[in-house]
Swiss-Prot record:
One of its GO terms (biological process) is floral organ abscission. Keywords: Coiled coil. Pfam families: LEA_4 (PF02987). It comes from Arabidopsis thaliana. This is Late embryogenesis abundant protein At3g53040. Residues 72-88, 97-169, 313-359, 368-387, 414-426 have a biased composition (Basic and acidic residues). Highly expressed in the epidermal abscission zone cells from flowers and siliques. Expressed in roots, vasculature of cotyledons and leaves, stigmas, anther filaments and pollen grains.
Length: 479
């Protein structure tokens, strides 16, 4: 505790000494600059009360400085030594504290300088009145103060330089120690770092080895898993392919069954249409036989009734009868040919249906049914057309024979001239049949041949007595 107080007192004394030295230095600086002027005047004997003037104030300040610097040299020296010891002790680890003290000292010096400047300005104002009396004294005192201040400044400078050298040496020693300490620490850090790097290197190698082993193990597991999955996928794919194969075979079988069913249905439909066509042809044939039978009966009856009428005809009538016979034969031949052509067309139509059915067995049942239906309509229509053509030709022939055999009119010259060929102006066809030059039973034979050509037959009525030429005029029916 006591040592701490002594150190505090020493520090305070050192600060006071530095402040006093700074103040004296500032005063000396002002004097050297010549800011203070002196004026010599005559000295009078007037006694005035003594009072301190500018010089007195300066001298008082200098005296205080002298007492502080010289009069208390022992204390100052002791304080200085103590301060030096303290500075030496603190130089190693308290460089920052020294900087703070230096800053504080500079601040104090500045404050003292400001205060001295203020006082100097005040003294300057008062000096104007006191210059005459105190000029010589002031000059002398100034010289003395200058000399003393110079000595003190020199001593202070030497002391400061010495202390600076000592501080420099101590600082160098400390810096050397710090340098050695830093080098040692750097070496230790380097060794520690190398050791740590070795440990890290070994650790990294171990970790890399472990990672490599784990990677190899994972790769092996992944390969095994991939292989298992590939086998499973292959098995599933094979199973699916088998299922799809079975499904495709089943669908192909179903398609073939449906095609066979469609083919059977189409064949059945074609058979039905063929039966229908044959039935229609049979009906047409029966109708033709019936019509020809009727025509035969009508012609025989008419011929018998007209025998008396025909027996009295002239040679012209016989010639016309011959022409009528030839024309009737041609008409019968044409009718038979037309009947054969229609039958051939129906046969070719049935054959075409068979070929169409063979080509379209792969089509759907609905399309086959539609086509069969259309074919049925076409066959029916063609059967009706054939039936109408045959019946129309036979009807026209029957009507012409009936109309002419039952009539009693005598042909005119115009009709006679047109007997060899049709009369275009009247729209009638003249047929001349030569009965005289024809053997007995010729008409019946012609009709029988016509029936045989069309696949029909009828009973022969025998020969017709007194056959002569018959002129038959077939007239076209006008609409």
């Amino acid at each position: 505790m006591a040592s701490g107080q002594r150190e505090a007192e020493r520090s305070a004394k050192a600060e006071r000494a530095e402040a006093a030295a700074s103040l004296a230095a500032e005063d000396l600086k002002d004097i050297n600059k010549g800011d203070v002027t002196y004026k010599l005047t005559e000295r009078t004997t007037t006694t005035e009360p003594e009072r301190p003037g500018l010089i007195g104030s300066v001298m008082k300040a200098v005296q205080g400085t002298k007492d502080a610097v010289i009069g208390k040299s022992h204390d100052t020296a002791e304080s200085t030594r103590e301060g030096a010891d303290i500075a030496s002790e603190k130089a190693a680890g308290m460089r920052d504290t020294t900087g703070e003290v230096r800053d504080s000292t500079a601040q104090k010096t500045k404050e003292t300088a400001d205060y001295t400047a203020d006082k100097a300005r005040e003294a300057k104002d008062k000096t104007a009145d006191k210059t005459k009396e105190t000029a010589d004294y002031a000059a002398e005192k100034a010289r003395e103060a200058k000399d003393r201040t110079a000595d003190k400044t020199k001593e202070t400078a030497e002391y400061t330089a010495e202390k600076a050298r000592e501080a420099k040496d101590k600082t160098a020693d400390k810096l050397g120690e710090y340098k050695d300490y830093t080098a040692e620490k750097a070496k230790e850090a380097k060794d520690t770092t190398a050791e740590k790097l070795g440990e890290y290197k070994d650790y990294t190698v171990d970790k890399a080895k472990e990672a490599k082993d784990k990677t190899a193990e994972k790769a092996k597991e992944t390969a095994e898993y991939t292989s298992d999955k590939a086998r499973e996928t292959k098995d599933k794919t094979a199973e699916k392919v088998g299922e799809y194969k079975d499904y495709t075979a089943e669908k192909a079988k179903e398609t073939a069954d449906k095609a066979r069913e469609a083919k059977d249905k189409t064949a059945e439909k074609v058979g039905e249409y063929r039966d229908y066509t044959a039935e229609k042809a049979t009906e047409t044939k029966d109708a033709g036989v019936s019509k020809i039978g009727e025509l035969k009966d009508s012609a025989v009856d008419t011929a018998k009734r007209a025998m008396g009428f025909l027996s009295g005809k002239t040679e012209e009538t016989k010639q016309k009868a011959v022409e009528t016979k030839d024309t009737a034969k041609e008409k019968m031949d044409e009718a038979g040919e037309e009947a054969r052509r229609k039958m051939e067309e129906m046969r070719l139509e049935g054959k075409k249906l068979d070929e169409d059915a063979s080509r379209k067995t792969q089509q759907s049942t609905e399309s086959a049914a539609d086509k069969a239906h259309e074919t049925k309509d076409s066959v029916a229509q063609r059967g009706e057309e054939g039936k109408g053509s045959i019946m129309g030709a036979l009807g026209n022939m029957t009507g012409a024979i009936k109309s002419k055999l039952t009539g009693a009119t005598t042909p005119s010259d115009e009709e006679t001239r047109a007997s060899a060929h049709g009369d275009e102006s009247t729209g009638k066809t003249v047929v001349a049949v030569d009965v005289k030059d024809t053997r007995p039973g010729y008409v019946a034979t012609v009709l029988k041949e016509a029936d045989q050509m069309t696949g029909q037959t009828f009973n022969d009525v025998g020969e017709i007595d007194d056959e002569e030429k018959v002129r038959i005029v077939v007239g076209e029916k006008k609409l």
